[in-house]
């Protein structure tokens, strides 16, 4: 996972397990955790590809229930303005 701080590694690994089991093909960390600005109170920003759209909110609920730290989940396949901007401008660290 590159430069991800150890305090986040356990939660990111757990999120990766949940996402993979749901069929997600790729996962990236972005934001403060990815660029080294995170603090103990930071959330984890995850960007994903390949998750069937009908599973997005189910998986988001599982992440919220099983990981104590707040998670923001962005679907890079949804074609939204934000996901396009994220792919163009944001540094992302690949998880899987």
PLM segments and residue spans:
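Catalytic core of pol beta-like nucleotidyltransferases
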Residues: 1-28, 34-40, 51-96
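Periplasmic OmpA-like peptidoglycan-binding domain that tethers envelope proteins to the cell wall
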Residues: 42-44
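Short hydrophobic/aromatic beta-strand micro-patches
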Residues: 47-49
């Amino acid at each position: 996972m590159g430069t991800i701080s150890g305090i986040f590694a356990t939660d990111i690994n757990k999120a990766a397990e949940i996402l993979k089991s749901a069929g997600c093909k790729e996962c990236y960390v972005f934001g403060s955790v990815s660029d080294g600005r995170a603090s103990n109170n930071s959330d984890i920003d995850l960007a994903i590809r390949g998750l069937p759209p009908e599973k997005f909110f189910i998986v988001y609920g599982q992440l919220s229930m099983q990981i104590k730290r707040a998670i923001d989940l962005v679907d890079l396949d949804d074609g939204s303005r934000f996901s396009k901007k994220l792919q163009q401008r944001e540094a992302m660290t690949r998880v899987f």
